[in-house]
Swiss-Prot record:
InterPro entries: Glyco_hydro_5 (IPR001547), Glycoside_hydrolase_SF (IPR017853), MAN-like (IPR045053). Its EC number is 3.2.1.78. Belongs to the glycosyl hydrolase 5 (cellulase A) family. The gene is manA. This is Probable mannan endo-1,4-beta-mannosidase A. One of its GO terms (cellular component) is extracellular region. Residues 1-21 form the signal peptide. Its main location: secreted. It is found in: Secreted.
Amino acid sequence: MKLNPSLLTAAGLVSAQLASALPQASSSTVSPSPSPSATPGSFVTTSGLNFVIDGKTGYFAGSNSYWIGFQKNNDDVDLVFSHLQESGLKILRVWGFNDVNQKPTDGSVYYHLLADGTATVNEGEDGLQRLDYVVSSAEKHGIKLIINFVNFWDDYGGINAYVKAFGGSKEGFYTNDAMQAAYRAYIKAVISRYSDSTAIFAWELANEPRCQGCETTVLYNWIESTSQYIKSLDSKHLVCIGDEGFGLDTGSDGSYPYQYSEGSDFAKNLAIPTIDFGTFHLYPSSWGTTNDWGNGWVTSHGAACKAAGKPCLFEEYGVTSDHCAVEKPWQNTALNTTAISGDLYWQYGDQLSGGPSPDDGNTFYYGTDDFKCLVTDHIAAINSRK
């Protein structure tokens, strides 16, 4: 998802800014590194067209929270994971990147400083120790995390943060030696912290990687080599791309998302041996399609994943209004489509110590009517199939 600052509520912005900038006085801000998981058997795996979590094979629901790793109040993090656990949501996708070109002077959390041709990983209390606590809390609450390493969009730095530090272009990121060396060094720094944690559902190459106007071989080669590198560092966890699902002949109606103009070939990329499952997103209002069109998008990706012999994760989907009416049919379609083994709505909202968590327009909050429709009732539908 590309964040739209104009849609963030004032309350959500205040909450996010306070959480990331202000140190908390209580002892709850101590940030322990996550301890290694107890049993190797609890690592997430795949079985045919399904995910296997904690020994259970089937369909799993979850959400996205780009902001949780930037909170400085541990109680807020624990509150979110407690509510996820209570609701039956099993997977949370979080931003594993926070790239800056200048070190913040206000105490804001950042993970990775890119400046003047150099890259420095921030392992301090205002850096990856915040992600440490997210992983630790996820372990305690039985939630699985998808952690990605860079953003195609400019939110929290993204690829353009690398471009500003090393030169070149956004499209050139995938083949530029200096940028790729910094990117891989960051991947290694993150994976080395959590390679033994069973809280990790999967490592994800990027949020919505695109290469507009490029031959599809550019992204393919980058995905292949990067996923191989990740597997060389950690063979225990799944690896995925984080793409939107663009570039697909199966079920194509010729509309923009099915085309190859963003440099992506969904089926070809999915066939890479070191990619364990497919990811796809759905934002009709951003893509010039209708809400009803989304159901065909879901089934087309299910068919492509079935052909590849790998499960699909419906990884992001959202609208800015009528959440229940619009998103419920997508959930039902995904739940009843072979090879789709989970969905994560965009995005989770909760009441934090500083106010509501950020609302980019697609957010709905814990305990609301939309939450009952799209989480409580959805989990009940999933459980009724078991």
